[in-house]
Amino acid sequence: MNLTQNKIPVYVTNGTCVTPLGINLIDNIQGIKDGRVAISKNIDNNLQKDPFYGAVINKELLNKTFSNLKYEGQFSTLEKMMLLAIDEIANNFKGQFNDKCGIIISSTKGNVDALSTDNRETYFLHHLAKKVSNAIGLETEPIVLSNACVSGIMAISIAKRLIQSGSYNHFIVVGGDLFSKFVFSGFQSFQAISSEPCKPYDKARDGITLGEASAAIFVTKDRALTQANSCYEVIGDSSINDANHISGPSRTGEGLFQSVDNAMKEAQIDSSAIDCISSHGTATNYNDEMEAQAYNRAALEKTPVFSLKAFFGHTLGAAGLLEAVISLAFADEDLIPPSLGYNEHGLTLPLNINNKIQEKKVEIILKTASGFGGSNTAVLFKKCITDEK
Amino acid sequence: MEAIQLFFLKNALQMKNNIIHYCNIKNSEVYLDGKKLYSAKGEEQFSSFIKGVYKNFDLDYPKFYKMDPLCKLAITTSSILLEGIKDNIDPNMAIVLSNKSSCIDVDLKHQASISQGDESYASPANFVYTLPNIALGEISIKYKLRSENSFFIFDGFNPEFLIKYANSLTLLGKSNSVLCGWIEVVENEYNAFMFIVKQETGIAFTKENLIKLI
């Protein structure tokens, strides 16, 4: 049996996001085009005495925008961010809620700050998931994926598989994580926080900048439901563990290479068909070098690659999804976003870092992510041709 | 005669995933394929109990002592399950684990270390374990499984989901077998249930059976 030929096509559409750059997709895309960034200098004595860089959402604006929506009850900051991200999708696809429609929530730490309060119940990721799914009136049991920094993009892959194997017809996928003392202090203890806004792939890069965001997308097997101006088929996906180290990536990029290779095999394409790569690019020495190894092994060293971390910071469980949503929105206009912060090549191998917005016909996009626990994910998206609809 | 042969051929081609081995660690006891292998009744501390299991089964993996409680439980359960089939482990075997409380014990430890005002300092040795999927990474490293890994969180054991997702992995050719399970530990309350599913003869991979076996 040729599995590839018998696979049900699965599409993504209606991507949205909430970041410090804007509380909707349009504001985020315009922000990037204008060269604005979500990262700013912050002063918070609770975190550390010296100022630090981070991408932190304006909570006043968030609360004000959220209060204009119809949701009743008490919600945490992260729940508000997630509901703001899925509000439009929930309205657009309400008609599919009773047609085997699931929800996947990707988050690494959820409402982790609840650990230091008396309200311990809100720590549990399922609690957060249930609040979000109840708020939009979806009755199926929410699925929480908590798989470090690949969670956001892996969630699309899980949705695709559960649709292709016949268990579901549609999924709302939402990812989110906060800028928390919990995570900030942890990365500080690793000496992995950059003293300046992060500089992916640059010679002077010295670590990550953290951020907070939520992002969402609708995944479906029903092509007719997708928006004419933004529809992508998920043509290949794979997540292969490095089996090497729990906090450092494989030096040879083994897991990422295998993930990309498997995704290309499933899509029945070779590397030359890929128009651009939306990479992980955290700006740590090890991560960026590992990606260079993997992309070179996959013969992708000439393909334009960009990291969005210098715009949004590392948004953990939201990152892969946020970056996919932004990349697809640029691809709608046949544009490749810039990889900000890159001046001098800082890798031992060549890569085609796309350092300014480029006009190019974009048909196939590769999104990858890598994270703690040795995790890697690669997903290939292909633009839907309008007249096929 | 021909019809019977065809019937068997068809069945062989469409053989379903079955549970071929399973391991439980709960209530101070260890079971493999339903058979009790170790008991420390009366041992109420998780940390002493799991150390006792580690020693009893000669797991010989010093990294064990560095791990957070979730990884200790995961590496112990998976080792007891996999040592029996060691020569026959498929390097492409996927790992799909789930629980309710993520890695709450080490999260609390990290949170306490950063909540002491000026005295606060985080330990990288703790922080690195503050993600539930680290347990998948530890199992992958020990058994060299370069494979699909995912960690899910539900309010309770969710056999329907594990069946749907594990079956999708084999159906879509992402892996030939899946190490699946529920792995929950909060202080001294714990329950680990891991099993291997594969297209081989075994216990039917059904919701009823999983509820019975956990």
What are these regions (language model features)?
Chain B
Residues 3-214:
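Conserved "HGTGT" condensation-loop signature of ketosynthase/thiolase-family condensing enzymes
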